[in-house]
Each structure stands twice: as structure tokens, then as C-alpha cells.
Amino acid sequence: MKFSKRVLLKLKNKNKKLKPNKYKQLKRESLRGLIKGTPERPRLSVFRSNENIYAQIIDDTNSKTLVSCSTLDRDIKLNIQNGRTCDASKLIGQKLAKLSLKKNITKIVFDRGPYLYHGRIKALADGAREGGLQF
């Protein structure tokens, strides 16, 4: 029996039968339908793992990554103790903004993925705003 994505998300809320990874995948796909990056306003995509955080600015119409940054980058890794903190996420946002302004990208669409806008995701967004990106 096949269900639509919306029905599966509702089932998750009602009886908690979906596995967490499947739920994240469905949530990501449902958000992806709403958020698209264009050459004028590319998409800032965020991935958060337990140890690190990764961010990239993507032009979806041409399927190209324009700018990327993570806590594994050498210059950021030297300035932080670990990639799990909000301070590290804020540095990632500021560096991403700096790199994107060099490529004349000022307006973006923020794609938080399946993650809540809280903690490290919010810190990254605040750092990008402080760096000069508008979203």
C-alpha cells in the first residue's frame, strides 16, 4: 500500500510508526518542493551531523554548487575546538556570507532541511545575516 508524503507525515504525528530516517527523508522532500534556488536567489542548504555542520549555496536550475563551507575547512578548524557548537556554526555562516559576496550573491533562500530552526541551524543563519546575506 503506497501513501502520499503528506499522509505519511500525518501518520508519523499520530502513531509514531515511521523510522526516524524515513521521516527525515519525507520531511526534506516535502520542503524541497516548496523551496527552489534560482540564479538570482540561490538556495542555502544546511546539513548537520553530530560532529560537524556543512552549508552550501546551490543554483537548482543549473544544478551547480556555487559556494560551500563546513567545519572541516582548515581555517575554521584551527579557530574552533569542535564542530558541535553554535559558535562554530556562526563562523560557518559568516565565512559562507564572505565567500558568496565575493561571487556577487547577496539574496538567498534558506533551506533548513529536516532540522528545526533552533540552535546550530539558527546560529548559522544569524552568522550569514551578519555577514551580509539577505533572506
Curated annotation (Swiss-Prot):
Protein location: Plastid, Chloroplast
Keyword Lyase part of the UniProt annotation: no
GO cellular component, one term: ribosome
Keyword Chaperone among UniProt keywords: no
MF GO annotations: 5S rRNA binding; structural constituent of ribosome
Listed InterPro entries: Ribosomal_uL18_bac-type (IPR004389), Ribosomal_uL18_bac/euk (IPR005484)
Pfam families from the UniProt entry: Ribosomal_L18p
Subunit structure of this chain's protein: Part of the 50S ribosomal subunit; contacts the 5S rRNA.
Function: Binds 5S rRNA, forms part of the central protuberance of the 50S subunit.
Family: Belongs to the universal ribosomal protein uL18 family.
Name of the protein: Large ribosomal subunit protein uL18c
